[in-house]
Amino acid sequence: MKLIVGLGNPGMQYQFTPHNLGFLAVDRIAEKYGIRVANRNCKALTGRGVIEGVDVVLAKPETYMNLSGASVQELVSELEIDGTKDMIVIYDDLDLPYGSIRVRERGSAGGHNGVQSIIGALDTQEFLRIRIGIAPEFKLSDGASYVLSQLKKSQLPVVDQALDDAAEAVKVILREGPGPAMNRFNRKPEPPESGGEVAAK
């Protein structure tokens, strides 16, 4: 069993914002594999299915971003899985170029409050994550306002491709492991972690 968690904020006002790309990625995965993410369980919307022959649970915590760890901790416990080996967390990253994908096996939160909440709840940085870049081309004066702003029409094609790439990264991880996924998607060197991301609530 693998747990695939997308991070975001619940509520229509946040649905199509950069900070909710984790939720949107889970929605894309669910669409591709015919999984219905509609059960309320462990403070999250969840759905069970099979991807590449692997039993999976897709989850979107409904706790608001900064409390994501509470939901993830409950899910890991209920599913009786090892969060360091059997979980993939998908989230937005303000330090990566817009629309890019990076697969990472461990590391700090890099300023992302949802990831920090998970690290705190599980007491480890050792879990697989797929990061979706949301860094704009212009210099930001207010990161919080930006990550919670509505996606612009001009950004949608890039976002659409990024969501497909995130779904493909999950498939590669489940079929071949994280190494091949990193080789495929981590094509450019990562910028240093700036801790510049500001999460909502």
Swiss-Prot record:
Domain of life: Bacteria
Organism: Koribacter versatilis (strain Ellin345)
Site note Stabilizes the basic form of H active site to accept a proton, residues: D92
Location relative to the cell: Cytoplasm
InterPro entries: Pept_tRNA_hydro, Pept_tRNA_hydro_sf
One term of GO molecular function: peptidyl-tRNA hydrolase activity
Ranges where the record places region Disordered: 178-201
Protein known as: Peptidyl-tRNA hydrolase
Pfam family, one: Pept_tRNA_hydro
One GO term describing the cellular component: cytoplasm
Subunit structure: Monomer.
Site (Discriminates between blocked and unblocked aminoacyl-tRNA): N9
Annotated NCBIfam families: pth (TIGR00447)
Record-listed E.C. numbers: 3.1.1.29
Main function: Hydrolyzes ribosome-free peptidyl-tRNAs (with 1 or more amino acids incorporated), which drop off the ribosome during protein synthesis, or as a result of ribosome stalling.
Location (main, coarse): cytoplasm
Signal sequence, renumbered to the chain: none
GO BP: any one term: protein quality control for misfolded or incompletely synthesized proteins
